[in-house]
């Protein structure tokens, strides 16, 4: 077992038809770390996430969840690895015809043999964790966008994953609600010790939660920077990284904006 490594990617190359999407990507994520995959639109960050959670196979390279190589392992090992992860996609993907509680209960009912009463207790615990206590009976259409994100987080946490993958968790949210989601991510990491891997281009969220960041570049299809948010902010050896991290609105030093290019 690779000591203190929750997940890693080694020499990952991805092509769709003849188009190169990711080129020779390698990095590792420590246990209990909040790790951000950063890049503008078209940089391949969501593609990388899909490969890390086993939804797609690369042209070459390896993805490890804990010590299991999910790109080459047997089916039984593959599902063992998947049991270690939870995923929240950008849309939150709640089933509209099911209540919030039923959405959160879905993976528990599908992958365990717990009784209905036990599942109800687990759902209550998860919803309380994300600040949605007593929202079990609401439909997704009856709650706000921020609440949908919280419900999606509760469902992603339903089976107590060691690693939580979040795809643009604050996308489409107003700044106040986005900051609340950032606080929730920090709280989950602290209380549960969950390793959290986030795909985003939201600079405010990166500085709020990330311990370490990799930055993908659309033109080279590769990692062009890696480090803490402050290290990347001060990395002006690379003009693109410098521009991405140091643009301001209204010529102030505090109001970071997104460069989604």
Describe every region a protein language model picked out.
Residues 70-86, 116, 233-236:
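ABC ATPase NBD coupling module
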Residues 164-167:
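Catalytic Walker B motif of ABC-type/P-loop ATPase nucleotide-binding domains
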Residues 98-106:
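Short coil-to-helix segment of the ABC ATPase nucleotide-binding domain corresponding to the Q-loop/switch region
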Residues 158-162:
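A short, proline-enriched helix->beta-strand linker immediately N-terminal to the Walker B motif
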Residues 53:
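Helix-to-loop junction immediately C-terminal to a conserved catalytic motif
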Residues 117-134:
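Conserved ABC ATPase "signature" region
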Residues 139-143, 147:
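Conserved ABC ATPase signature
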């Amino acid at each position: 077992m690779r000591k203190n490594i929750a997940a890693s990617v080694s020499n990952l190359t991805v092509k769709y038809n003849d188009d190169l999407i990711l080129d020779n990507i390698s990095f590792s994520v420590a246990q209990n770390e909040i790790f951000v995959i950063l890049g503008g639109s078209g940089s391949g960050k969501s593609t990388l996430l899909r490969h890390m959670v086993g939804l797609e196979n690369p042209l070459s390279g390896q993805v490890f969840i804990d010590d299991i190589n999910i790109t080459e392992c047997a089916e039984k090992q593959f599902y063992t690895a998947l049991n270690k992860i939870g995923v929240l996609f950008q849309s939150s993907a709640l089933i509209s015809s099911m209540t919030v509680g039923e959405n959160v209960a879905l993976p528990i009912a599908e992958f365990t043999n717990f009784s209905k009463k036990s599942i109800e207790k687990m759902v209550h615990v998860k919803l309380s964790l994300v600040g949605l206590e007593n929202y079990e009976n609401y439909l997704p259409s009856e709650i706000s966008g921020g609440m949908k994100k919280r419900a999606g987080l509760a469902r992603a946490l339903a089976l107590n994953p060691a690693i939580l993958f979040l795809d643009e968790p604050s996308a489409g949210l107003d700044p106040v609600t986005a900051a609340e989601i950032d606080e929730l991510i920090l709280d989950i990491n602290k209380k549960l010790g969950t390793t959290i891997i986030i795909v985003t281009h939201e600079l405010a969220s990166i500085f709020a939660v990330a311990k370490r960041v990799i930055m993908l570049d659309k033109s080279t299809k590769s990692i062009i920077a890696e480090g803490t948010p402050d290290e990347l902010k001060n990395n002006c050896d690379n003009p693109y990284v410098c521009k991405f991290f140091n643009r301001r609105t209204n010529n102030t030093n505090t109001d970071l904006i997104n460069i989604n290019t």
